[in-house]
Amino acid sequence: MITPDPIILVTFIGATNWGVGFLTTVAIFAIVALALNLQWGYTGIFNFGVVAFFMVGAYTSALLTLPPPSKFESHILGLELPILMGWFAGALAGGLLALIIGLPTLRLRRDFLAIATIGVATIIRSIANTTEGFVNRGSGLNGIPRFLNDFTSASDYKWVLLVIMLIMLSAVYFGLQRVTAAPWGRVLRAIRDNEDTAMAAGKHTVSFRMQAFVLGGAIMGLAGALWAHRTGSISPTAFNDLFGTFVIWTMVMVGGSGNNKGAIIGALVVGFFWFGTPLIQEDLPDFLGTRVFQLRELTVGLLIVLFLLLQPHGLIREKAQVSRFITCLLYTSPSPRD
């Protein structure tokens, strides 16, 4: 009987656990990338406050599903609602935040919305970190329940969680594929390419931009709720602009904007560099090993520069959309004259 080498076995188990955890995390961030792709890639909306919607969704779901606070905690709600209701509420909170931001800004120039989203993200993080009796301040929320955790063993739960996140990612992907391929999606692309022309064609561009912004915000809120129940604990310091906004933008840029498949591929590629770089810390020289987290930021920054210079359309270029009427005019041979 051949017995496996313990070192090889431990290495294999460790690699498997990391791979499952990596794919689970990337699935959540791919959902956020899909939402940003809807806003920016399809509609041309500059949302530099992605982390705000992600954070609001996470805290909303956590506060609704947690038990009442103990004497050592200080937060509102704690209603012990079912986790599925928490996910729905997280999506609703993200969409509501987008509506509140979009109403006064979407009628203005696009850079005003970008500035507003940055400011809102900073304000929300500051409120969560300093307000007494709201979300437990800097200590964060701990013991957030995990979906189906009571029905599976600890060793199997990582696989269950991966399947759940892949199902959620698939639902968001196919839903967005359907709506962006519909006339609604074509209007969004028309607004992105030339808003004045879309307006001249009789489209209420502000309304369409608001719809895309709110739907994208709701999807980001849903992803935040999934993240909260995946990690089991959240705190304001975990929701920084670098992790929650910069990395997501990089995923969309690398994968290819205006392309839902590209958003997912970009999440895999950028996620590999972002989450994989710390694994090589022990193999790096001392002066780099002690700066491994700065190194991964540099790596992601270099990815942006390289793609902007060499592959500006991303890994998967947006497919040109031509109406069937135009296609018939171009490719149908004219009938011969009598």
Region roles according to the model:
Residues 1-333, 337:
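Transmembrane alpha-helices and adjacent helix-loop boundaries
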